[in-house]
Amino acid sequence: MRNRTLADLDRVVALGGGHGLGRVLSSLSSLGSRLTGIVTTTDNGGSTGRIRRSEGGIAWGDMRNCLNQLITEPSVASAMFEYRFGGNGELSGHNLGNLMLKALDHLSVRPLEAINLIRNLLKVDAHLIPMSEHPVDLMAIDDQGHEVYGEVNIDQLTTPIQELLLTPNVPATREAVHAINEADLIIIGPGSFYTSLMPILLLKEIAQALRRTPAPMVYIGNLGRELSLPAANLKLESKLAIMEQYVGKKVIDAVIVGPKVDVSAVKERIVIQEVLEASDIPYRHDRQLLHSALEKALQALG
């Protein structure tokens, strides 16, 4: 009997945020509605941060980025969604997609309803779920015991991070937990380690679902050195250990990394190590190479 391929899977779930999650989702977009992205909602910088400070609510920027990368049929709607205002006025720097999502959030009962309306408008088949539907921020405690609030400030830290928390304490979106419970394969990464990947794992319902799922879990590493100094100083095995510390169990079965990563200390996990970088954008994963690496990981997992 042949091993399963990605095309055989009924439910693939990817966790993360930023450009990394969007890249993974677009590389697997052929799965259509069998693909689900669970998206980080703690961003407080840029257009997203301005909207949150003015209007409250969850962070929409990472969700918009994922939607952008899943658009396969360019249209007036998709051009509007991707439009960013220039100039020096009040709208300068704002992304229209963020504003559209925020407006639909006001008109909807739940943020998830707003996302589904936009998915239908943009003809995106993959499901996208915010990690929580409640406003929440990331907080770090550094090795001096200082509390640092918000992704922007955490990214600027120069001292090691000792602990991460979400503030306030919010529940995970129930559909996100259900997606993990039903998954045949779970993927986390690539993305900024402390500010794109870790926030999702801080939700107790998500951590519990990851502890209980029989689905294999694959970590995809970044291709370049992170700008965040605390994250940049972490070795691969340390990142895996930190993620599993917060989940509460050894859950990562395979890792996919580039050829320059030191994997010598990674034990008892499948390692897929090969060229993954796109030729047109430095430090971004090539969609086809990433898809191929995920196929190899799935084959190795059996």
From Swiss-Prot:
GO terms for molecular function: LPPG:FO 2-phospho-L-lactate transferase activity. One of its GO terms (biological process) is regulation of cell shape. Pfam families: CofD. GO terms for cellular component: cytoplasm. It is found in: Cytoplasm. Keywords: Cytoplasm. Its main location: cytoplasm. InterPro entries: CofD (IPR002882), CofD-like_dom_sf (IPR038136), Gluconeogen_factor (IPR010119). The keyword Cytoplasm applies. Required for morphogenesis under gluconeogenic growth conditions. Belongs to the gluconeogenesis factor family. PANTHER family: GLUCONEOGENESIS FACTOR-RELATED, UNCHARACTERIZED PROTEIN YVCK-RELATED. HAMAP family: Gluconeogen_factor (MF_00973). This is Putative gluconeogenesis factor. The gene is ybhK.
